[in-house]
From Swiss-Prot:
Enzyme class: oxidoreductase
Highest taxon of source: Bacteria
Location in or out of the cell: Cytoplasm
Natural source organism: Helicobacter pylori (strain ATCC 700392 / 26695)
Keywords on record: Cytoplasm, Glycolysis, NAD, Nucleotide-binding, Oxidoreductase
Binding positions (NAD(+)): 10-11, 36, 81, 116, 314
Family: Belongs to the glyceraldehyde-3-phosphate dehydrogenase family.
Complex and partners: Homotetramer.
Protein name (record): Glyceraldehyde-3-phosphate dehydrogenase
Classification of source organism: Bacteria, Pseudomonadati, Campylobacterota, Epsilonproteobacteria, Campylobacterales
Amino acid sequence: MKIFINGFGRIGRCVLRAILERNDTNPKLEVIGINDPANWEILAYLLEHDSVHGLLPKEVRYSNYKLIIGSLEIPVFNSIKDLKGVDVIIECSGKFLEPKTLENYLLLGAKKVLLSAPFMGEYDEKQYPTLVYGVNHFCYQNQAIVSNASCTTNAIAPICAILDKAFKIKEGMLTTIHSYTSDQKLIDLAHPLDKRRSRAAASNIIPTTTKAALALHKVLPNLKNKMHGHSVRVPSLDVSMIDLSLFLEKKAPKDPINDLLIEASKGVLKGVLEIDLKERVSSDFISNPHSVIIAPDLTFTLENMVKIMGWYDNEWGYSNRLVDMAQFMYHY
């Protein structure tokens, strides 16, 4: 399987690291190119030295438009001119979010496109599906362009799918307690859209927006107009937490809810949902590959209401789902 990565920021680099890690035990994924307009000497340095995920266990260097990782050589570019031979291009730049702009990759020769973000603009949802691996990826019908949704949607969708099937969700509210990201400011500096995101990310708790709950119906259609939420950005480099409050049609005691989630973690959602029984904190989940990690002691119920809290590495977990989805699209 031949993969091309466009955009070599936090997610692009994590995707490559995830592929390298998998290829150590099962070498089936070939990255045949990476594109980013930045300086490749610096990008090579950032791949090897990561403040969150640590030092890559192989030496990385750049030479003559090649990223050299140990004995592996990957062609790199500052612009894309040809994608012939590419099975799946994973779009990680954050620049191209409308499906029509992603069609340019098909014109350049790529067979399929996977977007590492929700789609923007108006589009045909059947032609351009939003898929969450483990929840609705089986709805894939060989479409050429797919959105992998957001890291937060990947975290809440497995939980909502299980509880809606068992208890029927009437409505819900989400708070994602989210590590700060590159769309925030290191010091107080004007943000183009959001006053609060203009404030120093590492010094403040910053309420802002999230589309994860509103977009959930694209993955679970029966939850349309039933979910809302917001984000609270916190001074943490990585790992976030969902605080999901749901009002159910049926009374939902704590133990049966936790039992359902534990059962799913061992079965249909193995590798996607994990259970934490050790009362861990955020730094313990750095580089955890699951979409969400549920802490059963943080499940609370009151009559028909339930609150569930779950951790997720918003970089590494999501990047692993991108690789899973790319492989699924290729083998379809």
